[in-house]
Amino acid sequence: MAKRVAGSKRYVHPLPIEPVVLPPLIAHNPLSWVYWVLAYVTSSNQLPRKIPLEVGADGRYTVTGREQMQYLWEHGFFGTGQLSRSEPTWQARTVDRLQLDTEGIAGHKLEQVTQLRRKQRLEFKRERASFERKRLELRRQGVLESEILEQERLWLKQLRDRELQWEASTGDPSPVRAEDAEIIAEDGASVLPIEKLELMPVEALFLTLALPVLHADAPAILARTLGPQPALPQIERLCRLYAAYHHYRSHGWCVRSGIKFGCDFLLYRRGPPFHHAEFSVMVLAPDERHDYTWYSTVARVVGGAQKTLVLAYVARRAAADQLAALWHARRYMEAFALFEVHELVYRRWLPGKNRE
Amino acid sequence: MTEAEELSVALGLHDSDAEEDALAQDWSEMAKLVKKANQHALPRRGEKDYEPDGTDAQALLLHTAKETMFGTLLNSVRGSTVKTLIKAYWEEEQRMARIPNARGSFTNTMGKVDKHGQCWLQLHEFVYLVERGTVSPYLALTVGDEKSNHEDVLLSVQDVYALFSSTEELDEFLVYAHLKRLGFIVVSTDNPPAHVTSFYPPLSQKSSASSNWFCHIHSWLKTPQNLFHVPLYHPLHFLLHRYTSSPQLYEELSQHIPFKKVPHDINELREERNNGILNPNVKQWKIAFNVWKPKSSFKKKTPGLPDFQVVVYNKDNAGQQFPTYDEFRSIFHRLDYRFDFLNELDVDDSAWDDYTYTDGMPTREFMQRNKIAPSQPHSGGDSRKKKARTYPQHIAQIRRLKSGFKSFILSVIDDGLVSFVRIAESDFGSSNIWYTPPSQTGTTNNRTRSDKVDV
């Protein structure tokens, strides 16, 4: 596993197909022409070996193999590690935790940090509750408000002191747990690769149809997602999602699942390690409508995370028959191209901030 | 991207509509302010208890807070002096209120004066002024046929509210009063000003169909290119093509899914207005109000283009449902306001005069003919605004995407509470945010391509 590498070095390619590097063509040097032509003919954008896609019994699309997972993550941030927050770091983390690697890797501790913070927060809440009880007690006894305030200050100070002390003292917790025996490999120096990279159905389609890097069969993927005899509304819904996904991907956005914020997609500039997502996309049909509570709820959740809500209305430009015909002829990309993306930005408007 | 740049992204983008408007009022401080009367800032509230804990101390705190709040309201001076009393008579026949001799600053933005010098108020204007205590409502009674024989019947606020004939009318009033109280200048679209200004040229000047023809030929010429094109998903594609940079790949990918390009500039706006074909079966939402930001130079007769346009939607009304996309399209098509995304016109009022039409003729010509002084460029404090902040290109691009292009305000009424949503057309398809690795080819040319912005 590579050590911590600067993002700009690690995430050089925004798409899983790497551009070919051709030698410089020098006009007055015929030898360079020959070399250039040779390089052109022998090079290819295609991967030497396509990445195999597995479809689990539960209908999930996964990629296994450390290199493959890493390749998809580093080339456009595709998929999510099943045992990680998003980047499949479980393996490295576990090796790190169990101290199996003699070199001792730092930098894969994102999840640990989260865990630690959650613990601290919980601790604080418990402390606060106990103080609230104490204050109630004091009030019942008829203690003056100013005195209670004094007590509160004292308590806050104590809390802060303890926190500082705790931060200084926390070392690594004892590394090995009982259940770890099952995941340590025979040689005792590594862990079993049980983490998989899971792809959204639209991601799997994109990497199979638009950018052929997955070794997979599109009809099989679709049959798995929609069932063997999908109804037209189901097909349309998938087409809409795919059209939106492809649209944003093709204009340079890094598109990831928006389930965390109750919407369909999140749009990142460049990728999650570099920026927070700036937009949340909800994919809708042009004639689709919900009650106002639906919109305001989504907008609240998204707005609370400092993102802008985009309502992507994906409209079908041709008759339903045409879509069905293309679908059954398995000309999926042409079917997707029947859809057109329209966008509205939904945002709360504050009169006070728009007065001048 | 350096950290400094990232920081500037964070600072530059999250400034405007942050959720920091939830300031509750502390009335005990307010009570002191009423006496001083000169200060306008409200102080922040103190710490809040979450639930009643049954202690006397808490009950006492609550009691004093309530006491000061009601005390503040009760003890301040109320009522109006007889000298400044303005009587407004409700004329049921016209469904308007009449003020025989109107005076006061409200006449700058409200009411219409007829040739007898009487000021006529719309129902919502009437109710708003009654609620404020600016006018006293009277019922105009005609005894027999004699107009002169008026008997003054003073109306109560309840009576005045009873004049609303439908829920829609009441909803519109709620929005009107809310925006009015916040200082905006609000004019109902039911009551157009004497001289209507439009961004769009009158229909007779509509450009001929020739541009359409041109488009056809243009698209025709493009087809041969497509004949030899092997799409990306074709098995042979990678045998025939070599991509030497990521933008080439993106270029190829973006061929597949079409997107709706929304108007970005003056010509596109006008073209869309002329050529846009809309589904006539779609519900036509009413654009209820034109709204101007507070300004002293407002003229009732020639107000010019509004700053915002408002559509009213009552969430609890079973007859109204949230608009679908087609309904949104129809609203966007009818919008006619100061399109704030037009950079070239953002400078001052006088620039807009060159691009708008009043009563069917260019506004500048109209003003000369009617001897109206041209709009003054904003003076004093606004000169600072002219030097609008300029952002680095990549931030400007995101800001543009976030604010969109044409927009309107959807005011949502929920149990009598008004909240606002800004709906804007956006266009992610017209601007690319490709990332190109800088080290790969070593040329600076690549870098500039990735920064390309079509705003």
From Swiss-Prot, chain A:
The keyword tRNA processing applies. GO terms for cellular component: cytoplasm; mitochondrial outer membrane; tRNA-intron endonuclease complex. Keywords: Lyase, tRNA processing. SUPFAM superfamilies: tRNA-intron endonuclease catalytic domain-like. InterPro entries: tRNA_endonuc-like_dom_sf, tRNA_intron_Endo_cat-like_sf, tRNA_intron_Endonuc_cat-like, tRNA_splic, tRNA_splic_SEN2. The active site is at 268, 276, 307. GO terms for biological process: tRNA processing; tRNA-type intron splice site recognition and cleavage. Its EC number is 4.6.1.16. It catalyses: pretRNA = a 3'-half-tRNA molecule with a 5'-OH end + a 5'-half-tRNA molecule with a 2',3'-cyclic phosphate end + an intron with a 2',3'-cyclic phosphate and a 5'-hydroxyl terminus. Heterotetramer composed of SEN2, SEN15, SEN34 and SEN54. Interacts directly with SEN54. Constitutes one of the two catalytic subunit of the tRNA-splicing endonuclease complex, a complex responsible for identification and cleavage of the splice sites in pre-tRNA. It cleaves pre-tRNA at the 5'- and 3'-splice sites to release the intron. The products are an intron and two tRNA half-molecules bearing 2',3'-cyclic phosphate and 5'-OH termini. There are no conserved sequences at the splice sites, but the intron is invariably located at the same site in the gene, placing the splice sites an invariant distance from the constant structural features of the tRNA body. Belongs to the tRNA-intron endonuclease family. This is tRNA-splicing endonuclease subunit SEN2. The gene is SEN2.
Curated annotation (Swiss-Prot), chain B:
This is tRNA-splicing endonuclease subunit SEN54. It comes from Eremothecium gossypii (strain ATCC 10895 / CBS 109.51 / FGSC 9923 / NRRL Y-1056) (Yeast). Belongs to the SEN54 family. GO terms for molecular function: tRNA-intron endonuclease activity. It comes from the Eukaryota. The lineage of its organism: Eukaryota, Fungi, Dikarya, Ascomycota, Saccharomycotina. One of its GO terms (cellular component) is mitochondrial outer membrane. Residues 366-390, 434-455 are annotated as: Disordered. Non-catalytic subunit of the tRNA-splicing endonuclease complex, a complex responsible for identification and cleavage of the splice sites in pre-tRNA. It cleaves pre-tRNA at the 5' and 3' splice sites to release the intron. The products are an intron and two tRNA half-molecules bearing 2',3' cyclic phosphate and 5'-OH termini. There are no conserved sequences at the splice sites, but the intron is invariably located at the same site in the gene, placing the splice sites an invariant distance from the constant structural features of the tRNA body. tRNA splicing endonuclease is a heterotetramer composed of SEN2, SEN15, SEN34 and SEN54. Interacts directly with SEN2. The keyword Nucleotide-binding does not apply. Keywords: tRNA processing. The keyword tRNA processing applies. Disulfide bonds: none annotated.
